[in-house]
């Protein structure tokens, strides 16, 4: 029997604010444990929360970027549960009046994992609908040692935005693409750095399976706190197969909360799945209703940048790039800006794009440390090729040196003496030498075997250590053979 997976994601995004959601404590990753805390984020009696305006604006901005409906009013609620890293024994969140409802994320071809990528030219693009976007506070972080445990409350109270998708996702690969596309939008809007290693983007997955074609959905399980996009894909692959195996043997799926054990490569039960009523939500009496219309929405609208899909379209139209080139360059706003700066003074814009995509990204493993190379270097390199002073193979080698040594193409050419030989006089002599040294190739060429010309070209290229202009050599050989034939 064939089965179908039904998947929905809850993505928690740490907002890019200077201070916490309800107090003035600094948000600082890696600070000394419990050094960024106060009575408010420690939940001490009598300490009253005060909402962070910037966090509210960033949440509204996200909703606008996703095409959500912005609520005229939003409120904060207490989500009650006990956990050691929750100092108040409740979390301030939003229940029935979130700041944003609806919206969608479009899956673009290059967002899929490399071993499952779609055709960049494909016209059909699936959209994953958004249920809601709401604001809540983060909890502290537990640390477990050999004989005891500790809690760092520096993270408690950090602004978190939760983005809940509809259960529109049908495979681990679509989940991967959704997270990649969503992260791209958030980075473009400068809402969050989305650094998963620092816990700035975490994901909970709801997944169930059902016989293909059946309308009724199966019993869902939730996999908590997945901290990488690849982990989401791996966890879903395993859990889908586990549920299919359970159903195939005639057993039933238990609704439960799971965690992903990366070392064992399997999901592990944590507890039975909670329902909304288990949390006893009620409005937070210490916080007023948030009125979004007017100033807050106006400020959020000002911050909306050119979004990824818009940038891809513009790169295609302005620079005559194809879908693949524009998608790669637009995958990161920093890379796209870098390309545009490089292309501004290049005679061949497409060549600059190809150098960045095919050569630069292959050797620059860390974009943030690689980008300080002046963008003008790629314009200069492209122009040297256009002017016939370098051929493509030399240019590709120069990119490696540029990244490693932070030197300009002109400086590298001068230091290594690798400029292209374009002198007709010099190359004419070498072509005559090639003809004299390779009588069989000459005979083959004159008898109609045109490919024999490559042997003569190879002779000249070897003599010049690859520095001869291949097109000039080709033309001179044809001309000389014709004149001496």
From Swiss-Prot:
* EC nos: 6.3.5.-
What are the record keywords, sorted? ATP-binding, Ligase, Nucleotide-binding, Protein biosynthesis
Write out the GO MF terms. asparaginyl-tRNA synthase (glutamine-hydrolyzing) activity; ATP binding; glutaminyl-tRNA synthase (glutamine-hydrolyzing) activity
InterPro entries assigned: Asn/Gln-tRNA_amidoTrfase_suB/E, Asn/Gln-tRNA_Trfase_suB/E_cat, Asn/Gln_amidotransferase, Asn/Gln_tRNA_amidoTrase-B-like, GatB, GatB_C_1, GatB_Yqey_C_2, Gln-tRNA_amidoTrfase_suB_CS
Kindly state a single biological-process term from the GO annotations of this entry: glutaminyl-tRNAGln biosynthesis via transamidation
Q: Which SMART domains match?
A: GatB_Yqey
Reactions listed under catalytic activity: L-glutamyl-tRNA(Gln) + L-glutamine + ATP + H2O = L-glutaminyl-tRNA(Gln) + L-glutamate + ADP + phosphate + H(+); L-aspartyl-tRNA(Asn) + L-glutamine + ATP + H2O = L-asparaginyl-tRNA(Asn) + L-glutamate + ADP + phosphate + 2 H(+)
Which PROSITE patterns does the annotation name? GATB
Similarity comment: Belongs to the GatB/GatE family. GatB subfamily.
Give the matching PANTHER family.
GLUTAMYL-TRNA GLN AMIDOTRANSFERASE SUBUNIT B MITOCHONDRIAL AND PROKARYOTIC PET112-RELATED, GLUTAMYL-TRNA(GLN) AMIDOTRANSFERASE SUBUNIT B, MITOCHONDRIAL
Show the HAMAP family listed in the entry: GatB
Function of the molecule:
Allows the formation of correctly charged Asn-tRNA(Asn) or Gln-tRNA(Gln) through the transamidation of misacylated Asp-tRNA(Asn) or Glu-tRNA(Gln) in organisms which lack either or both of asparaginyl-tRNA or glutaminyl-tRNA synthetases. The reaction takes place in the presence of glutamine and ATP through an activated phospho-Asp-tRNA(Asn) or phospho-Glu-tRNA(Gln).
User: What is the designated name of this protein?
Assistant: Aspartyl/glutamyl-tRNA(Asn/Gln) amidotransferase subunit B
- What species is this protein from? Methylacidiphilum infernorum (isolate V4) (Methylokorus infernorum (strain V4))
> Corresponding gene?
gatB
């Amino acid at each position: 029997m064939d089965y179908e997976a039904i998947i929905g994601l809850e993505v928690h995004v740490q907002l890019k604010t200077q201070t916490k959601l309800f107090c003035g404590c600094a948000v600082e990753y890696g600070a000394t444990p419990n050094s960024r805390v106060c009575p408010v984020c420690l939940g001490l009696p009598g300490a009253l929360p005060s909402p962070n305006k910037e966090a509210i604006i960033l949440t509204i901005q996200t909703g606008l970027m996703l095409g959500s409906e912005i609520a005229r009013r939003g409120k904060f609620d207490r989500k009650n549960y006990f956990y050691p890293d929750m100092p108040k024994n409740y979390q301030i969140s939003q229940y029935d009046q979130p700041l944003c409802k609806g919206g969608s994320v479009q899956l673009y071809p290059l967002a899929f994992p490399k071993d499952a990528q779609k055709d960049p030219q494909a016209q059909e693009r699936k959209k994953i609908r958004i249920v809601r976007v709401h604001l809540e506070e983060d909890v502290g972080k537990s640390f477990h040692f050999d004989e005891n445990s500790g809690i760092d409350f520096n993270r408690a109270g950090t602004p978190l935005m939760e983005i809940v998708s509809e259960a529109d996702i049908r495979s681990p690969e679509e989940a991967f693409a959704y997270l990649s596309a969503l992260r791209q939008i958030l980075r473009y809007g400068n809402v969050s750095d989305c650094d998963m290693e620092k816990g700035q983007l975490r994901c909970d997955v709801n997944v169930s399976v059902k016989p293909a074609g059946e309308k009724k959905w199966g019993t869902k399980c939730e996999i908590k706190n997945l901290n990488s996009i690849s982990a989401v894909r791996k966890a879903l692959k395993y859990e889908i197969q586990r549920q299919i195996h359970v159903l195939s043997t005639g057993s039933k799926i238990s609704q439960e909360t799971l965690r992903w054990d990366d070392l064992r490569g399997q999901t592990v039960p944590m507890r039975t799945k909670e329902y909304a009523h288990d949390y006893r939500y009620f409005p937070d009496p210490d916080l007023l209703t948030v009125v979004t219309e007017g100033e807050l929405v106006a400020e959020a609208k000002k911050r909306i940048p050119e979004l990824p899909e818009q940038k891809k379209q513009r790169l295609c139209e302005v620079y005559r790039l194809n879908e693949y080139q524009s998608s790669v360059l637009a995958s990161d706003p920093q890379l796209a800006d870098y390309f545009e700066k490089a292309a501004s003074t290049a005679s061949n814009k497409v060549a600059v794009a190809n150098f960045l995509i095919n050569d630069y990204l292959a050797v620059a493993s860390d974009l943030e440390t690689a980008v300080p190379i002046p963008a003008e270097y790629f314009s200069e390199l492209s122009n040297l090729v256009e002017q016939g002073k370098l051929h493509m193979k030399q240019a590709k080698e120069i990119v490696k040196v540029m990244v490693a040594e932070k030197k300009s193409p002109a400086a590298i050419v001068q230091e290594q003496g690798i400029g292209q030989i374009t002198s007709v006089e010099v190359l004419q002599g070498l072509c005559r030498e090639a003809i004299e040294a390779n009588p069989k190739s000459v005979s083959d060429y004159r008898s109609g075997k045109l490919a024999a010309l490559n042997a003569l070209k190879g002779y000249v290229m070897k003599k010049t250590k690859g520095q001869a202009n291949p097109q000039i050599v080709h033309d001179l050989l044809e001309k000389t053979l014709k004149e001496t034939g």
